[in-house]
């Protein structure tokens, strides 16, 4: 399992990619593999406020429904609408096609508090 080095990670298996003043968020390869085949993704509306460690959406797989937890505080500025018609992107391409939301962070320094790729890899090996 390849863990991209340029991202930050939460304990709930979300990734964050800094893009200028914004942050792109999705779920990790580890998370999608644990969930199995994704059949539906529910995401917030543009303009919604998300709060760190609180649910901002959910993914439904053939096995279960799992909540998505915000890794940082911020305002949703973009939602990946491709996931409405193609939720399988989460399984096929969790770091590219299956990003979930783009957020304008309330405090960009929160991102630095998330795990590095190395720390995330250690955590997933313990699970």
UniProtKB/Swiss-Prot annotation:
Q: State the free-text cofactor note.
A: Binds 1 lipoyl cofactor covalently.
Q: Which residues form the Lipoyl-binding domain?
A: 22-104
Which cofactors does this protein require? Answer: (R)-lipoate
Q: Which UniProt keywords apply?
A: Lipoyl
Presence of keyword Transferase: no
Record CDD domains: GCS_H
Tell me which GO cellular component terms the UniProt record holds: cytosol; glycine cleavage complex
Provide an example Pfam family for this protein: GCV_H
Knockout mutant characteristics: Strains are lipoate auxotrophs. The requirement for lipoic acid can be bypassed by addition of both acetate and branched-chain fatty acid (BCFA) precursors.
* One annotated GO biological process: lipoate biosynthetic process
Give all N6-lipoyllysine modified positions.
63
Q: Which Gene3D superfamilies match?
A: 2.40.50.100
Question: What PANTHER family would the database entry show?
Answer: GLYCINE CLEAVAGE SYSTEM H PROTEIN, GLYCINE CLEAVAGE SYSTEM H PROTEIN-RELATED
So what family is this one in? Answer: Belongs to the GcvH family.
Description of how the protein assembles with itself and partners? The glycine cleavage system is composed of four proteins: P, T, L and H.
Instruction: Say what the protein does.
Output: The glycine cleavage system catalyzes the degradation of glycine. The H protein shuttles the methylamine group of glycine from the P protein to the T protein. Is also involved in protein lipoylation via its role as an octanoyl/lipoyl carrier protein intermediate.
How is this protein named in the record?
Glycine cleavage system H protein
Which species is the source of this protein?
Answer: Bacillus subtilis (strain 168)
């Amino acid at each position: 399992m390849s863990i991209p080095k340029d991202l930050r990670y939460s304990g709930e298996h979300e990734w964050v990619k800094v893009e200028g003043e914004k942050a792109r968020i999705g779920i990790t390869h580890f998370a999608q593999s644990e969930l199995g085949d994704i059949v539906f993704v529910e995401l917030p509306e543009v303009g919604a406020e998300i709060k760190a460690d609180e649910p901002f959406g959910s993914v439904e797989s053939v096995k279960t429904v799992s909540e998505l937890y915000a890794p940082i505080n911020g305002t949703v500025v973009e939602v990946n609408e491709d996931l409405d018609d193609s939720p399988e992107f989460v399984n096929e391409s969790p770091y590219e096609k299956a990003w979930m939301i783009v957020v304008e962070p309330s405090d960009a320094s929160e991102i630095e508090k998330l795990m590095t790729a190395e720390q995330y890899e250690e955590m997933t090996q313990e699970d």
